[in-house]
Swiss-Prot record:
GO molecular function, one term: structural constituent of ribosome
PANTHER family xrefs: 30S RIBOSOMAL PROTEIN S2 PROKARYOTIC AND ORGANELLAR, SMALL RIBOSOMAL SUBUNIT PROTEIN US2M
Short name of any one Pfam family annotated for the protein: Ribosomal_S2
InterPro entries referenced in this protein's UniProt entry, alphabetically: Ribosomal_uS2, Ribosomal_uS2_bac/mit/plastid, Ribosomal_uS2_CS, Ribosomal_uS2_flav_dom_sf
Name of the featured protein: Small ribosomal subunit protein uS2
Source species of the chain: Parasynechococcus marenigrum (strain WH8102)
GO CC term, one of those recorded: cytosolic small ribosomal subunit
Taxonomic path: Bacteria, Bacillati, Cyanobacteriota, Cyanophyceae, Synechococcales
GO biological process per UniProt: translation
Gene: rpsB
Amino acid sequence: MAVVTLAEMMEAGAHFGHQTRRWNPKMSRYIYCARNGVHIIDLVQTAVCMNNAYKWTRSAARSGKRFLFVGTKKQASEVVALEAARCGAAYVNQRWLGGMLTNWTTMKARIDRLKDLERMESSGAIAMRPKKEGAVLRRELERLQKYLGGLKTMRRLPDVVVLVDQRRESNAVLEARKLDIPLVSMLDTNCDPDLCEVPIPCNDDAVRSVQLVLGRLADAINEGRHGNNEQRGGGDAEG
């Protein structure tokens, strides 16, 4: 059975690429045609790639690999958080901070600081501080929660990075490749398929397209971990 149908992808608008002048020639094998100055992605190729990505991701999850979802653009942010949480993956959905992977020791210290501040807040310790000091601590807490909240369950570097927008998340791509962390990437027509191990050619700007792809990948992770496809079920938190 196909992981995703052509009808589902059409309905999600997964076939719409970018303007032809913005294309990357390396994506030519995934492009069906051009209409009104816009490239149309070959959804037959996308379906094949989705099947491959599902199997690859399921196998990685079955072998205990840990996943990091990355997507900071407005239309992807909420979906990234929801689907990552559903399959127990870590996520970055606000802004990629330089060194999130390549300077992991420092980043882990910031995550530990976030956990400490959350414990202080829940225990009432911050409320007991002088008003000015408490305000400073709460501002620090809010900032850390915004940018690092999705990484609290990540005790070490991820084994796989799942990416929504390769061009926007170019720093994440560079860091993952520097550390030889494989990338499962949604690729619009302006992307470079050579910069990822598992390509998924599709519209990476439409919310429904992002929902469709990340939803299936989250299903694959849950199936790999739990032995069945737990659609819309809760995933285990990464420990």
